[in-house]
Regions:
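Membrane-embedded catalytic cores of phosphoryl/pyrophosphoryl-handling enzymes
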Residues: 4-5, 111-171
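Membrane-helix interface segments
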Residues: 43-44, 75-80, 107, 142-148
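Hydrophobic alpha-helical transmembrane segments of integral membrane proteins
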Residues: 81-110, 170-171
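N-terminal transmembrane-helix/juxtamembrane module of multi-pass inner/ER membrane proteins
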Residues: 1-59, 99-112
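Interfacial segments of alpha-helical transmembrane regions
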Residues: 3-8, 64-92
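Aromatic-anchored segments of alpha-helical transmembrane domains
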Residues: 12-16, 88-95, 154-167
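Hydrophobic alpha-helical transmembrane segments
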Residues: 53-72, 129-132
């Protein structure tokens, strides 16, 4: 199951890359942002801003550090290395792709949060995906693996949707 999710993720990234300069995709992007802008509420604004805060790099480093401390106490050094290299590799790849594609962010009229740098790919979504994939890989044989899988997928999908909702990224 984890390999299927990785395949789906790679397929999604490939489709996104191919569609970056497609006028139909760009029209869809603008229409989606306008639709979300028209359906904002204070309640949803609060949820999405909260997700944006806990999905950034500082929070990701804190979560992974606490996880690694717990693993260190039980002498699971291989998993600590796996988590560390996954976070480092995913972040490096994401920032390289941002530099390579250098896609502009949506117009500031849609933004509910301050952003900087390129839009594609979303660093928040990369961090959420790396964390979700780590959790899925490490706990795939756990008694509650299906619930863990569902929550991990909900986390990275929610992060991606929240970044679009906040006007920080195109869909």
């Amino acid at each position: 199951m984890p390999y299927l999710l990785i395949f789906i993720g790679c397929l999604g990234i490939t489709i996104s890359i191919v569609g970056l300069n497609n006028p139909y995709i760009q029209h869809f992007d603008i229409a989606s942002l306008a639709w979300m802008d028209g359906h904002r509420t204070p309640f949803l604004n609060g949820i999405n801003v909260f997700l944006s805060h806990i999905g950034g790099l500082p929070s990701m480093l804190i979560i992974c550090s606490l996880w690694c401390i717990t693993l260190y106490q039980s002498k699971q050094f291989t998993q600590i290395l796996f988590i560390s290299f996954s976070l480092l590799g995913g972040s490096t790849l994401g920032w390289f792709l941002k530099w390579f594609f250098d896609r502009a962010r949506p117009d500031a009229i849609y933004a509910l949060t301050e952003t900087y740098g390129a839009s594609f790919p979303s660093a928040h979504s990369i961090y959420a995906t790396v964390l979700s994939c780590l959790i899925i890989f490490i706990f795939h044989k756990h008694a509650y693996a299906r619930i863990i899988l569902f929550l991990a997928c909900l986390w990275f999908l929610g992060m991606g949707i929240s970044r679009v909702y906040l006007g920080a990224h195109y869909p």
